[in-house]
Amino acid sequence: MFAVLNYIDRNNAAAARLKGFEQDLNLTDTEFQTLLSILYVGYILFQANRSPFQNRIGRPSLYLPAAMVIWGMISVLTGITKNFVSALLTRFFLGIIEAAFLPGALFILSKWYRKDELSLRYTILYCGNLISNAFGSLIAAGVLANMDGKLGHAAWRWLFYIEGALTMFFALVAIPMLPDFPHNTKRGFTEEERQVAQLRMLEDVGELDQDSREEKWYTGFVLAMSDWKIYILMLSLTACVTGLSFNIYFPTLTKTLGYGTTETLLLAAPPWVFACLLALLNSWHSDRTQEKFWHSTWPLLMGIMGFIISMATKPTNKAARYVALFFQAGSYAGYIIMYTWMSSSFPRPPAKRAVALAFMNALSQTGNIAGSYVWPAKYGPTYVKSYGVVLAMFVTTILLNLWFRSILVAANRRLAEGERAFGEHNDTVEQAAKLESTTVRDAKQMQKGFRFLI
């Protein structure tokens, strides 16, 4: 539910656009695109330090709901904006506060679940994004159709009021329900259950999922920044996020089918339900087979097929273009696998993983900034040029993922060699530590049966 509301509050401007948002605030097309992109500027600037901070304070049960209350309040305030500048400020601060959620949620899951269980759990989390597009469209359809002029407020303003209030309500309800980390959570688990949770992580990699007491606060940052695998995956994620920018404009793309506001929002929901089901099935199979590259690639190829159909057909061909929207939405199944691949590729120490998750997720959001300007109204209603850009981004993503996979294959080969030499040649272990940008202590633990998922 946190994820659903996170993305609803982030993307509701796209639905508000259909019912006078631009006209009432006297926005140009470029100004509207800037309102979409400025959220990700705040997101990027303030996200990289959030997971390490959460790792240090160890109380996500309080940290995440507090952030949720604040971003819900900011969403409500968006409804009272009068011009471009006031809307720009609310969107910027919304990005700052929402930056706490995703890396924090990913990090919590990585503390409770083993690497062979993460794909399905991450997918359930990311289905919040997919369902938010469907659920948010249905809410918007009802609000925009029935609330116009109520108490003297435009329907799009009511959309921000209602969705922001829902966010704050669920945040307060969630406080007594959320756990902390396995080693310090107090609610909902017996001491035996906490020990079992910690032992599961011990079996997964060969050590408890806790930072060494001797490690300095900046150790995780240094280890993460010196691991060049992070930069490859970051570029891949950035290209993929740019390719997924159709999500921001999905109501606009659906409206090119030629229907009214209510019908458009209702038609925008089914592709995301399909995407959610596809993502769950794909992630379940990825966990079962312990394979990442192909499970991230084939949904992107399906998305490319959707782009090609949209480029090759005219707006009058409603059936083909609507099917293409299903294919495009389904490409999210590959993006989700990329995130689980990211987490499992930087397992220990937790401080390094926290920095890696936050850094890659934050900088990959530059793709959303760029993507906000890929879909100008002048390219409509066919958006051929826009589809050409996102198609190229998906191809780039696949090629970078192939490179990343080859690096992990080589790393697994080195780990196997180091495992055979373990206890005989300390220099081999030290070399492995240097190659994997980690400490000698962690390299020794990783030698004990650990392999990167490819």
How would you label these PLM feature ranges?
Residues 1-29, 50, 136-140, 239, ...:
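Extracytoplasmic
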Residues 1-11, 19, 29, 175-210, ...:
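Intracellular terminal tails of multi-pass secondary transporters
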Residues 9, 25-26, 49, 58-59, ...:
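Helix-breaking motifs and short loop linkers at transmembrane-helix boundaries and internal kinks
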Residues 14, 219-283, 372:
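Extracytoplasmic gate region of multi-pass secondary transporters
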Residues 37-52, 269-281:
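Central cavity-lining transmembrane alpha-helices of secondary-active solute carriers
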Residues 45-85:
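Conserved MFS/SLC helix-loop-helix module at the cytosolic interface between two early adjacent transmembrane helices
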Residues 119-152, 161-167, 357-370:
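Glycine-rich segments within core transmembrane alpha-helices of 12-TM secondary carriers
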